[in-house]
């Protein structure tokens, strides 16, 4: 992973959202290279769980985050509604174990207890929005984007941009109206937070990394334009 950082910078990316499994299982030398280049690691993308029995994984992630000092950490809660209070208690304890200036960014992914915007708004209502933010996925679904911004506007701090299929290629004029509509919602809400190109066209079993990267650069240019 570290070998890509200079190329990312050269091609106009401000930093990287570092996938947890590109760091924790990496050899010590690679971890040290990433720590040395930590200013390039804007977001740490974690897959820890928040059930009581997952405390060891949370501790390992907290140690990695302390070493890397990212501006934020992306996470998700679990999908068991009966464990809502347990997840919340462990989330708050985990926040205390992280650097004080590290923002906690909930992806509110499908299949989790916070996949609905109104549920996420209620869960975070009494927590500091500067510390406890959310991630919104932006593509061609303007109505979905509007719902998240309307419910959690002051808490939206990070965007995941997914342009996976050919219908999401911003270089094709016919695709632009739907894509532009989604980003118009973002602009209308005065968003000034960070953006990650999460997935681009070409991912799959027979994927070509150079093709995917070229597409990601196309997506980057589009996001900067709109």
Q: Can you describe what each PLM-predicted range is?
A:
Residues 4-6, 28-35, 58-65, 88-96, ...:
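Generic structural signal for well-ordered alpha-helices
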Residues 50-136, 211-215, 219:
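Active-site acidic/histidine proton-transfer and metal-coordination neighborhood
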Residues 15-30, 48-57, 79-86, 111-116, ...:
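Acidic-and-aromatic substrate-binding clefts and catalytic sites of carbohydrate-active enzymes
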Residues 192-213:
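C-terminal alpha-helical cap/extension of soluble enzyme domains
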């Amino acid at each position: 992973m570290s070998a890509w950082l200079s190329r990312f910078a050269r091609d106009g990316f401000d930093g990287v959202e570092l996938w947890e499994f590109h760091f924790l299982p990496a050899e010590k030398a690679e971890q040290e290279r990433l720590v040395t280049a930590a200013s390039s690691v804007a977001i740490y993308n974690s897959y820890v769980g928040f059930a009581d029995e997952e405390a060891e994984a949370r501790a390992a992630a907290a140690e990695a985050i302390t070493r890397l000092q990212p501006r934020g950490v992306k996470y998700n809660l679990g999908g068991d509604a009966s464990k809502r209070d347990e997840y919340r208690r462990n989330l708050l304890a985990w926040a205390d174990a992280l650097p004080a200036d590290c923002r906690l960014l909930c992806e509110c992914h499908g299949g989790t207890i916070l996949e609905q915007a109104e549920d996420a708004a209620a869960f975070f209502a009494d927590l500091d929005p500067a510390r406890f933010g959310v991630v919104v996925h932006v593509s061609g679904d303007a109505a979905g984007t509007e719902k998240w911004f309307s419910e959690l506007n002051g808490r939206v701090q990070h965007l995941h941009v997914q342009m996976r299929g050919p219908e999401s290629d911003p270089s094709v004029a016919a695709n632009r109206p739907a894509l532009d509509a989604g980003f118009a919602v973002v602009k209308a809400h005065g968003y000034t937070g960070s953006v990650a190109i999460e997935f681009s066209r070409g991912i799959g079993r027979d994927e070509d990394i150079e093709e995917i990267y070229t597409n990601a650069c196309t997506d980057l240019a589009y996001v900067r334009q709109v």
